[in-house]
Amino acid sequence: MKKLNTQSPDFQAGLKALLAFETAQNPETERIVADICADVQKRGDAALIEYTNKFDQTNAKSIDDLILTQADLKAAFERIPNDVQTALQTAARRVESYHQRQKMESWSYTDEDGTLLGQQITPLDRVGIYVPGGKAAYPSSVIMNAMPAHVAGVKEIIMVVPTPKGERNDIVLAAAYVAGVTKVFTVGGAQAVAALAYGTETIPQVDKITGPGNAFVAAAKRRVFGVVGIDMVAGPSEILVIADGTTPADWVAMDLFSQAEHDEIAQAILIGTSQAYLDEVEAAMDRLIETMPRRDIIEASLGNRGAMILAKDLDEACEIANYISPEHLELSVENPQEWAKKIRHAGAIFMGRYTGESLGDYCAGPNHVLPTSRTARFSSPLGTYDFQKRSSLIQVSEQGAQKLGETASVLAHGESLTAHARAAEFRMK
């Protein structure tokens, strides 16, 4: 891991270098995705079947071979162990409870001239959620993407999940059952994103696509944005821990590992105010790494993008955190709620020594789909509001037509838009 000290004259340069991440799009990936999207848009189901058989090594004869029914999802739920059933239900219940509180409601008011103004909230009609498939599958992603849509009142939630070599993951399908997914198609990659965006003979066009995927999925989401909405194009996973030295070093070490084990370009950063404590955490990491099944990935991640930063105090640590704008921020300090008030930019803030980031990944309640790559400066977590729309309401009274008409007429003439002005003037006495 890199070692940085805020008192060093080259600290800012070192921090910028640490956060630099090459996000340039691969031209070859973009070309392949463009061809796939165009083909699916043109040939529909036939293209989808061909690409699925080619990339996932399946042997689908027709689109019916790629459809899972509610009965299939229920059967998957019944096949998994009881403790896993309970865990899925507990996580879904907590995520649902949290996202209920995010639900936007319609409102209106009448101003002094009798004009009614307001905002009408409606859910999206149909959404698609992309879920990675195969052995390394993530049922938590199903819950985090589907449940907010369910709470928002979306009538149709369509899930696509690849099944390489026909391998289905029962826990993922069980999560879909618990989270209220309407339909499931066993397709993945750019072809699945294109099918959701453009529609095929069998897969209906959705209004928005959410969920994580590989570089091809990300490129496809970028390409279809505008035809449909998307949640975000996520970068590598990130964690920043601010520690005051009161949390056991082993706990902090494992929290850093929890993000580093995602992949070699994930980022784990620790900011401390004591060199002795940073050394203690480093020693704990050296000891605990021996027990990690994904040791190679963790070591590569920490070597590539990990860091320990020595700050002069917690105020400075918080300012650094605001600059980094991390996906996950742990405030492993005393009085964490007070320090949280100093944080302006973070996807999720985990307060106190007992609030490990992994609890938020699975079952605390808030969404784990979070802005990465410093986009927390202007972006927010996935939520119920992402599956709702706002429409403005305006009902002008006869009296209001006089008052507003005068203003609109003057402004319209100022813009040389005569018809606009006349439309307002016709309603004036």
Swiss-Prot record:
Pathway the protein contributes to: Amino-acid biosynthesis; L-histidine biosynthesis; L-histidine from 5-phospho-alpha-D-ribose 1-diphosphate: step 9/9
CDD domains in alphabetical order: Histidinol_dh (cd06572)
Cofactor(s) the record lists: Zn(2+)
Statement: the UniProt record of this protein carries the keyword Zinc: yes
Reaction(s) catalysed (UniProt annotation): L-histidinol + 2 NAD(+) + H2O = L-histidine + 2 NADH + 3 H(+)
Phylogenetic placement of the source organism: Bacteria, Pseudomonadati, Pseudomonadota, Betaproteobacteria, Neisseriales
GO CC field: cytosol
UniProt keyword annotation of Chaperone present: no
Binding of substrate, residues: S237, Q259, H262, H328, D361, E415, H420
Co-factor remark: Binds 1 zinc ion per subunit.
Active site: E327 (proton acceptor), H328 (proton acceptor)
Family statement: Belongs to the histidinol dehydrogenase family.
Purpose: Catalyzes the sequential NAD-dependent oxidations of L-histidinol to L-histidinaldehyde and then to L-histidine.
Gene designation: hisD
EC number: 1.1.1.23
Molecular function as annotated in GO: histidinol dehydrogenase activity; NAD binding; zinc ion binding
Protein name: Histidinol dehydrogenase
PROSITE patterns documented for this protein: HISOL_DEHYDROGENASE (PS00611)
